[in-house]
Regions:
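Structural motif
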Residues: 2-8, 28-31, 51-54, 73-75, ...
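Glycine-rich beta-alpha loop segments
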Residues: 4, 13-16, 25-26
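Histidine-anchored nucleotide/phosphate-binding helix
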Residues: 8-19, 110
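Short, charged/polar "capping" segments at the starts of alpha-helices
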Residues: 9-12, 32-38, 58, 101-107
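Long alpha-helical solenoid repeat scaffolds
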Residues: 22-24, 33, 45-50, 62, ...
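Extended, intrinsically disordered, low-complexity regulatory segments of metazoan chromatin-modifying
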Residues: 45-46, 52, 67, 90-94, ...
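Cysteine-centered metal-binding/redox modules
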Residues: 73-78, 84-91, 99-105, 111-112, ...
Length: 431
């Protein structure tokens, strides 16, 4: 975004709209002060990056686009035509330039257009179809920009008073910024998905049992349990832990909320800013409800959420329901052997940050993270057959003693994009 919007409110709203869609936004010129004025948090981890006040600082983001072509597109230095073809086709970037435009901004905009990035402006100037789109009101810029680049975004609109976006996933809430904390290492906490009969569930019922955030002292620690009850014709108990593993990501996507851990070892911090914006416990329920219904629509017909902070009730839920349930799941796996199954599963969930990483998950061999069991991988595959966990056959043994199979090696080669040739499941000494 180049220049200042007509008002600071409009500028900040545009920036936040992109941030909520998971789009990286870089800022040049007056828009930076507008964001500061409107308390928009900025930084690389929040995907809103101020580059500088002078229009020439736009070169930093051009550099990112060019490097994308060199690194990921294998474009050779000096191949200008190949570079421009790559950025046009593969780098879904665009420019929003606010009026008044001067010659330097126009020159920078022409450079963007040459790379295939359309420029949208609110200035009343001439149009170059698909390249320079004038007279776009600030409120329409988001939709017009996505349209110009044919970007389709699946958004889950959730009724909460703060933003919900993957940009907030790595956000750290420091003790001094924290309104309250729920800490499973000190008090009883747990998170649980429980399959029920359809008649036992009232869809979208969010219940808070116990004191809410405004009844806690600033900086205090408390117990929490949230139980997500689901029902559906194709729902299976095996899917419960798969949903639970996603809670970490869902809750972290809330602006000003930090979540770590899983099962009964969780910690959640809620920031003062988020509390002051009106965030309360029912909103945790809203986030869990919306995401479970959205992501697992194929198997979840009805969903209700209970958020419990009554300490005695949380202790009861943790020890009498959650822990026995976790133990039952673990015991089921503990009695299974690799020989007892016909197939293993691959998992590439970590390729988001480690592009050639692949795990082969077997009953006796969890994924590297320790959080994906053979049952979890199986359920993930059933829920999303083209997703991160794929069936790996084990029909062509090379050496069963060290767990080497031709078909497992083939899978490892395929999913690591050739970075790994083979794997022995039981030995790091011999192979
Ligand atoms: S099983 Fe492997 S790839 Fe999958 S989430 Fe765990 S560490 Fe990552």
């Amino acid at each position: 975004i180049l220049g200042a919007a007509p008002t600071a409110e409009e500028g900040a709203a545009l920036v936040k709209s992109y941030q909520e869609q998971g789009i990286l936004v870089t800022l040049v010129g007056g828009i930076i002060d507008q964001c500061i004025e409107q308390n928009v948090k900025m930084g690389a981890s929040l995907r809103v990056i101020p580059l500088g006040y002078d229009v020439t600082s736009v070169i930093h983001v051009v550099s990112v686009a060019v490097r994308a072509a060199l690194i990921f597109g294998n474009v050779k230095p000096g191949d200008a035509a190949g570079l421009m073809a790559y950025t046009k086709e593969r780098v879904p970037a665009f420019v929003n330039a606010f009026s008044p435009l001067n010659e330097v901004i126009v020159a920078a905009g022409a450079g963007a257009i040459a790379l295939g990035f359309p420029v949208l402006t609110n200035e009343d100037t001439f149009e170059v179809p698909g390249a320079l789109i004038p007279k776009v009101a600030p409120a329409d810029m988001n939709a017009a920009s996505l349209d110009a680049r044919n970007i389709k975004i699946k958004i889950t609109k959730i009724d909460i008073p703060v933003s919900f976006a993957s940009a907030y996933e790595g956000e750290i809430i420091r003790r001094g910024d924290m309104q309250v904390e729920f800490d499973g290492s000190r008090v009883d906490c747990c998170e649980l998905v429980h399959m029920k009969e359809p008649g036992e569930i009232e869809d979208h019922k969010i219940e808070v049992i116990g004191p809410d955030l405004d009844e806690f002292e600033v900086g205090s620690k408390h117990s929490i349990a949230y139980v997500v009850e689901v029902a559906g014709k194709s729902m299976q108990e095996d899917f419960e832990p798969v949903f639970e593993r996603k809670f970490h990501s869902y809750i972290n996507c809330i602006e000003g909320v930090m979540h770590t851990g899983q099962r009964d070892m969780i910690r959640i911090r809620i920031s003062k800013d988020t509390f002051n914006a009106g965030f309360r416990l029912k909103h945790i329920g809203e986030v869990l409800y919306a995401n479970v219904k959205n992501e697992f629509a194929a198997v979840v017909d009805k969903c209700q959420v209970k958020v419990i902070t009554d300490p005695e009730l949380v202790t009861k839920i943790r020890h009498e329901i959650a822990v026995p349930m976790f133990n039952k799941r673990d015991e089921r796996l503990a009695t299974m052997t690799d020989e007892a199954v016909d197939v293993y599963y691959s998992c590439i969930m970590c390729q988001a940050f480690s592009p050639s990483h692949v795990c082969i998950v077997t009953p006796e061999r969890l994924g590297l993270c320790g959080a994906v069991s053979w049952f979890d991988a199986k359920a993930t595959n059933e829920l999303d057959p083209t997703g991160p966990c794929q069936v790996v056959t084990k029909e062509k043994p090379i050496d069963e003693r060290i767990g080497e199979y031709e078909d497992v090696n083939e899978a490892v080669r395929k999913f690591s994009h050739g970075a790994l040739d083979d794997v022995s499941l039981y030995s790091i000494m011999e192979k």
